[in-house]
């Protein structure tokens, strides 16, 4: 953020400028404006397709839309209400899921459509299609290997990007990411959190239920209290063993 006023900026530009430098600056400014104009045209075209797609759906009008309260970045954001369009298509506010962005919503709408949940029997089959479920190889009741197959799925990549944005997030999903990262590593945390987001996404749309953070897992405070309780029990056990040894 620029802290200087317009007057200060204008005054700092006063001076003797070479003609070729001014020409280069003018060219760069014109190019920037041209690119912004093309981006705005793309936004309008995308919105036009969303309007047409929404009109084809046999969905009754719903006035129960409630905008999520999380902060949404405005840098390079589209200039139309993606959150409302997604709600009109899926009838739940997917933007409420931590890590979900307007760009992610647009990609999921374009790749999945409105009735994708009917094409998967279970949430597990959907996550498996996203390539977010490890391919467990079991022999004789023993787990030999558990790796996620190396195949590309665009929607799966979207959920991975959503998971990556939760590294410092203070929601339960953010705590979940950091807990898995401390135990298994960064890559495993990305896949595990993306899997969890995908399950929430599918369940919300399949059951037409809004996002409920209380059902996504324990928060960091509860986890800390559990660790304190377990540590206290271990200390008590050690104290008892020490008392027996000293007798």
What are these regions (language model features)?
Residues 1-247:
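A detector of single, family-specific signature residues
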């Amino acid at each position: 953020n620029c802290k200087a006023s317009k007057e200060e900026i204008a005054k700092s530009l006063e001076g003797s400028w070479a003609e070729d430098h001014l020409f280069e600056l003018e060219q760069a400014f014109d190019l920037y404006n041209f690119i912004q104009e093309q981006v705005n045209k793309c936004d309008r075209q995308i919105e036009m397709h969303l309007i047409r797609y929404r009109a084809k759906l046999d969905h009754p009008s719903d006035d129960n839309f409630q905008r999520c309260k999380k902060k949404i970045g405005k840098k390079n954001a589209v200039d139309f209400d993606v959150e409302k369009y997604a709600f009109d298509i899926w009838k739940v506010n997917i933007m409420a899921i931590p890590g979900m962005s307007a760009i992610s919503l647009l990609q999921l709408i374009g790749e999945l459509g409105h009735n994708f949940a009917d094409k998967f029997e279970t949430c597990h089959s959907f996550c498996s299609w996203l390539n977010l479920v490890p391919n467990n190889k079991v022999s004789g009741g023993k787990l030999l290997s558990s790796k996620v197959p190396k195949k590309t799925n665009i929607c799966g990549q979207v959920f991975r990007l959503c998971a990556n944005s939760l590294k410092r997030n203070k929601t339960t999903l953010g705590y979940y990411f950091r807990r898995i990262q401390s135990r298994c590593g960064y890559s495993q945390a990305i896949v595990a959190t993306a899997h969890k987001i995908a399950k929430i996404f599918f369940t919300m749309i399949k059951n037409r239920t809004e996002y409920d953070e209380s059902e996504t897992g324990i928060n960091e405070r509860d986890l800390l209290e559990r660790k304190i309780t377990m540590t206290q029990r271990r200390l008590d056990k050690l104290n008892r063993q020490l008392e027996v040894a000293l007798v």
